[in-house]
Amino acid sequence: MVFIADYGAGNLRSVHKAFDYLGIEAVVSDKASEMSRYDKVLIPGVGAFGPAMEALNRQGFDEAIREHIDKGRSVLGICLGMQLFLSESEEMGAYKGLDIVPGKVLRFTSSTDKIPQIGWNSVDYCKDSVLFRNVPDQSYFYFVHSYYCAPDEPESVAATTFFAGKKFCSAIEKNGIFAVQFHPEKSSEAGLQVLKNFAEF
């Protein structure tokens, strides 16, 4: 069963609906105290980094997520949820993240591409990955974002994508910590397979 954290900044309905379609039991909850009952935790996210971190902290999800990881259990961050895993972000100022993946969240700059990136883009694998099992390399996924993750540790990068003249980290996989910048719940069969792989890990 998958615990989907409701901290007021998530695409909860579409994520829950995707698991329901896959026949995988998932629960949406705004109570951090309930997280310890589940082996899999998903942190969705749509919105701005600062308010999202404030909400996580206020509801106690920050410590609950760290404790979950310390127990060797797996977690998946989606879009903003991925960015919250990093150490800090420059979005609308300087904000500290969960710091479970060392690195920064930076803004795209481009004179040619329109920002934010909205739409389909391909994903190039950097290593054998649990998340991308049975998903062909360079599959297309759906993105909506103006900021990207820049992890300090290259070995944590599971996949990259090219946008705004830059190859950026579009997926992270590290000791049961998983994160994707794209929205798997909006990415057709490839995205559903990613969610299935996480749930079955």
Swiss-Prot record:
Predominant location: cytoplasm
Database matches in InterPro entries: Class_I_gatase-like, GATASE, Imidazole-glycPsynth_HisH
Catalytic site positions: 79, 183, 185
Cellular location(s): Cytoplasm
Pfam name, any one: GATase
UniProt GO MF annotations: glutaminase activity; imidazoleglycerol-phosphate synthase activity; lyase activity
EC number: 4.3.2.10, 3.5.1.2
A GO BP annotation: L-histidine biosynthetic process
Catalytic activity entry: 5-[(5-phospho-1-deoxy-D-ribulos-1-ylimino)methylamino]-1-(5-phospho-beta-D-ribosyl)imidazole-4-carboxamide + L-glutamine = D-erythro-1-(imidazol-4-yl)glycerol 3-phosphate + 5-amino-1-(5-phospho-beta-D-ribosyl)imidazole-4-carboxamide + L-glutamate + H(+); L-glutamine + H2O = L-glutamate + NH4(+)
Its biological purpose: IGPS catalyzes the conversion of PRFAR and glutamine to IGP, AICAR and glutamate. The HisH subunit catalyzes the hydrolysis of glutamine to glutamate and ammonia as part of the synthesis of IGP and AICAR. The resulting ammonia molecule is channeled to the active site of HisF.
Subunit structure: Heterodimer of HisH and HisF.
Protein name: Imidazole glycerol phosphate synthase subunit HisH
